[in-house]
A protein has these predicted regions:
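A short C-terminal boundary segment appended to hydrolase-like catalytic domains
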Residues: 1-18, 27-28, 269-315
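N-terminal active-site segment of His-dependent metallophosphoesterases
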Residues: 1-89
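Extended active-site neighborhood of metal-dependent phosphoesterases/phosphodiesterases
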Residues: 5-24, 86-181, 222-224, 264
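Beta-strand-turn-beta hairpins that frame and shape the catalytic cleft
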Residues: 21-34, 138-148, 180-186, 243-249, ...
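Acidic/histidine-rich helix-loop elements
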Residues: 33-57, 112-130, 155-167, 203-208, ...
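Active-site neighborhood of phospho(di)ester-bond hydrolases with catalytic His/Asp-centered motifs
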Residues: 34-36, 73-79, 103-109, 187-190, ...
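Active-site environment of divalent metal-dependent phosphoester hydrolases
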Residues: 41-42, 81-87, 107-117, 153-159, ...
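Conserved beta-sheet core of the metallophosphoesterase superfamily
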Residues: 97, 200-280
Length: 315
């Protein structure tokens, strides 16, 4: 067992991820459990990238842990399911049934219909009804404006056969109007508009550019125009943080991948504290780490970046 990896230590319950000066509130602290890439599978096997065989159990543990932290909301940054099968959505709902806090989610590319599906994936409209107050959405949590966007599907269907994402023009218009009224915005979307060159440089066999936001310029300009301090994304399965032009982009850890964790986001008078909360047992973490280490070059590149990130926390 790799005892030098912090999350293989059963006594390591949480790890500070980052402290940001903004967003902040005038008094009330808002506490959010931010999960991403849960990839719930009904009949799944372990792969170098995802612990499909443990996803339901990991999600249930995360919900129980979040309940114990008295969070105000449970927020998911996309890819709730393995491949959007109705049975996977049913299992997801079963595993989050015990959540004390209200749940909100944005869709990931694995949650929407795709051209190569061998099953009938529920339409985006159902996702918006069941897991959000519509899409896009603005949801007030105390003094915080939680803003959720859909980057997994566009009206023209251009994303139906790919894994990258895009925020549609209609959503950008809505976002421009909405941010003009938001006092303390926290924006959540599945696909990350800022790239991860640290990972791409390590894996020549992995086309990272096709897995990000396809046309990020207008989106990033809009966030900059409204001085949005924090954007939380998922999708890449590598916990990271990047600053650019006043914006901090956080890629949340994937619950289905090493280090089998979620983020606790606490927004208060002194700014925002992000804490990494692992929910995998020691054996789960060891297995997840070793599966990634035995994978292809891009799996090992993701693992090495994640490993270095964990060792150097907080950002």
């Amino acid at each position: 067992m790799r005892s030098d990896v912090p999350f293989l230590d059963p006594d390591s319950l949480t790890t500070p991820f980052a402290h940001l000066s903004d967003p902040r509130t005038d008094g009330e602290t808002v506490r959010i459990a931010l999960l991403s890439d849960t990839h719930v599978a009904v009949d799944g096997e372990a792969t170098p990238r995802k612990a499909f065989h443990r996803t339901g159990e990991l999600l249930e543990r995360a919900v129980e842990d979040a309940n114990g932290r008295d969070v105000d909301r449970l927020v998911l940054a996309g890819d709730l399911t393995k491949d959007g099968h109705p049975d996977e959505f049913a299992l997801f709902e079963e595993r989050v049934e015990g959540a004390d806090a209200p749940l909100l989610a944005v869709p990931g590319n694995h949650d929407v219909p795709k051209e190569n599906d061998d099953h009938e994936t529920p339409p985006l409209s159902r996702f918006a009804r069941r897991y959000a107050p519509g899409l896009p959405f603005r949801h007030r949590v105390g003094p915080v404006d939680l803003i959720g966007l859909n980057s997994a599907e566009t009206p023209d269907g251009v994303l139906s056969g790919v894994h990258h994402g895009q925020v549609s023009t209609d959503q950008l218009d809505w976002l421009d109007r909405t941010l003009g009224r938001a006092e303390t915005p926290l924006v959540v979307v599945h696909h990350n508009p800022l790239s991860l060159p640290q990972v791409a440089d390590r894996a020549a066999d992995w086309p990272w550019h096709v897995y990000r936001h396809a046309d990020p310029t207008s989106f990033l300009r809009l966030l900059d125009d409204h001085d949005v301090p924090l954007l939380i994304t998922g999708h890449q399965h590598v916990p990271s943080l990047r600053h650019e032009n006043g914006l901090t982009q956080v890629i949340a850890p994937a619950l289905a991948s090493y280090p089998l964790s979620y983020l606790l986001v606490e927004i208060g008078v002194r700014g925002t504290d992000l804490t990494l909360v692992p929910v995998g047992m020691t054996g789960d973490l060891t297995e997840s780490y070793e599966n990634a280490a035995a994978g292809e070059a891009h799996h090992r590149a993701m693992l090495s970046y994640t490993d270095e990130t964990l060792r150097s926390l907080p950002f």
